[in-house]
Design a protein with these regions (language model features):
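Conserved SAM-binding loop
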Residues: 2-85
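S-adenosyl-L-methionine-dependent methyltransferase catalytic module, highlighting the catalytic core
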Residues: 57-68, 72, 76-181
Length: 181
């Protein structure tokens, strides 16, 4: 099974759509912050979560726990979120939390173990919430006018440039893999 949470009007063929707004006519109208997903354990192989996670408040953790429950081992969660230092994130009053690769790695048991071993001051959220997501891949989506400016530049230059300025990176695209073994 494939699900699209926070689907809005974006219907993806062969995906079950889930949205809070009944006007979007989802397959399931529910609140992912509080409701139990209507699927059996280990039933989902792919999740699309495009521009939804940044809208979640305290229910963010519940949503991740529910995704973990319904996903099979090896399931892929495809996340797209606005970069927290872009006006698209800052201007929308419904954006409640920044979502970053650094924040998502806290939901990895491997990263939690590495943090404890090295004495890093990071939250062991995988252990606390009993989930385990590893980052399979992630990349920046820069604003169109910066795409050419970065061609051939060393990664260190790009990172420094991004960290010193706003509105350079429009989005993060992140893929998580679910670990249950």
């Amino acid at each position: 099974m494939k699900i699209n949470i926070g689907s809005g009007y974006d219907k993806i063929p062969d995906f079950v759509s889930i949205d809070y707004d009944k006007d979007n006519e989802p397959d399931y109208c529910l609140n992912v912050e509080t409701d139990t997903l209507p699927f059996e354990d280990n039933a989902v192989e792919t999740v699309v979560a495009h521009h939804i996670l940044e809208h979640l408040g305290d229910g963010y953790f519940h949503c991740l726990q529910e995704l973990y429950r319904v996903c099979k081992h090896g399931a892929i969660i495809d996340i797209r979120v606005p970069h927290p230092r872009h006006d698209a994130f800052l201007a929308d009053p419904t954006h409640r939390r920044p979502i970053t690769p650094m924040g998502l790695q806290l939901f990895s048991k491997k990263f939690n173990e590495l943090s404890k071993k090295n004495g890093w001051p990071s939250s062991t959220l995988a252990e606390y919430f009993k989930v385990d997501f590893d980052i399979l891949e992630w990349h920046y989506i820069p604003e169109e006018k910066y795409k050419q400016a970065f061609v051939g530049k060393p990664k260190e230059f790009i990172e420094e440039y991004i960290n010193e300025r706003n509105n350079i990176i429009k989005e993060f695209h992140i893929k998580l893999i679910v670990n249950k073994e």
